[in-house]
Amino acid sequence: MNNIRNFSIIAHIDHGKSTLADRIISECGAVDSRVMSAQVMDTMDIEKERGITIKAQSVRLTYKLEGQIYILNLIDTPGHVDFSYEVSRSLASCEGALLVVDASQGVEAQTIANVYIALENNLEIIPVINKIDLPAAEPQRVKNEIEHIIGLDCSEAIEVSAKTGVGIKELIETIIRKIPPPKPGENNPFKSLIYDSWFDNYLGALALVRVYDGAVKKGDEVYVMGTDKKHTVLDLMYPNPIAPIKTNELKTGEVGIIVLGLKNVSDVSVGDTITLAKNRALEAIGGFEKAKPFVFAGLYPIDTDKFEDLRDALDKLKLNDSSISYEPETSAALGFGFRVGFLGLLHMEVVKERLEREFGLDLIATAPTVTYEVVQTDGVSVEIQNPSELPPVNKIEFIKEPYVKATIITPSEFLGNIITLLNNRRAVQTKMDYITTTRVLLEYDIPMNEIVMDFYDKLKSATKGYASFDYEPSDYRVGDLVKLDIKVAGEAVDALSIIVPEEKAMSKGRDFVKTMKELVPRQLFEVAIQASIGNKVIARETVKSMGKNVTAKCYGGDITRKRKLLEKQKEGKKRMKAIGKVTLPQEAFLSVLKID
């Protein structure tokens, strides 16, 4: 028990977290050097391609020091803001964390966010300065930054290079010396926290747990508190990225996989507590927050017959990613689909990509929206995620929208660009701090709606990619918001409705109809494209009809004959216009996302 160390690695994207994990694994000899691949911990293809960690992974390592064998459980965490939920989950099951900072880049916005999660969990934090082999490395400057921003003492910070392997041995020994062993339970009944669960085609739903009290053996009957169900333990394993290692017992402080042979991962949902059926723990393990979706979008199969396939795919994906929520919805324009809730934009992209890749679906995603709180004139307040659910204008007292607290770290030369960008996004500055003479930390309150579309891309281009950005939800505030509807040939297209601030409605509406005019195919009759708020049309464009020469057959002859044919054509067009349907191409729905 005293020889167990549970720790995770905190870092901003690209600061070398997965490489450092690989280095520690190979130093401990857990994975054969022939099998060792770059980024052993990142098992998904998307993770390797994008160079990001999405799912938290774990590995059990052994290390010999001064004649004693130590067990190190390394719990990998994602660095990206959308997956901070995975981070808080991983950190809840550790006693310590390595704070990895790139020696040339310095502290970034997401590093700060994750450190605060670690400090809230009272973890022992070891600062690690990585990439000291780079010519641009300035370890001393980075140590000063950590002390200035986070307030951690860096006198004993460890300098390593995960690429060349310098300092890795010293790092492992520091982990053993500094990170405390798990606290022993006072002979309490078995109690463990599920901090990850996923689906295996052979074994069913697997629960990755951290044991807090007692022990569990193969064949024991266990009780899952959240679902109020009993199951028999079929197998126990220690996690390893290549293949799990079987064991007969999991004891206090250990991290392991429990196999219960379940068909459904919702039976072992993340954050739940597993205890023994006979000798139950009295209360569940607390301090665990469920993920709350922030961004909602409609996902529709391009082939409408594939609706059930999409449902199956989402069910299976939820097994691995407990943070998505979804419910069926229908759209007059797109047919049947789902309203899916995501943690953020990167999460939305990754989920859509995984659905298309792993399940072979072709999907249309509508414009992402956030949850609004609408207080009606009768005093009733409702939450809406879809603009088409908004009550009629005369029934709305006011609308509240979610705000986020954003932290941005940027080189000072781009400060002007960033302030301009944020002012255009209705942001309010709350703090500005010069970390060094060349780097600035900014804090802003921004409406969530302003960052869900393309804020991250715009920020990167305003700062040539040097700024880092992180956000956390803060509160709901009353906003001056209206619903902008788009009508094509007199019919409102529900999938194109968006909620916008009133002062931006005119310009958005104009841009909208202009873009749509280019995309709607020409018909045999005129098509009006209108942007409206309630019944008031604020912008309009017309797609001209295709000409058809009805008088071509008349050679010479009387003018009245031609006039008669032209009149007849005019009548026909009028009738067509009244009943004509216009089909919108896929690009029309995506164009919404591109309008600034």
UniProtKB/Swiss-Prot annotation:
PROSITE patterns: G_TR_1, G_TR_2. Signal peptide: none annotated. Residues 2-183 form the tr-type G domain. It catalyses: GTP + H2O = GDP + phosphate + H(+). GTP binds at D14, H15, G16, K17, S18, T19, N130, K131, I132, D133. Its main location: membrane. HAMAP family: LepA. The keyword Hydrolase applies. Belongs to the TRAFAC class translation factor GTPase superfamily. Classic translation factor GTPase family. LepA subfamily. GO terms for molecular function: GTP binding; GTPase activity; ribosome binding; translation elongation factor activity. This is Elongation factor 4. The keyword Nucleotide-binding applies. It is a peripheral membrane protein. Keywords: Cell inner membrane, Cell membrane, GTP-binding, Hydrolase, Membrane, Nucleotide-binding, Protein biosynthesis. The gene is lepA. GO terms for cellular component: plasma membrane. Its EC number is 3.6.5.n1.
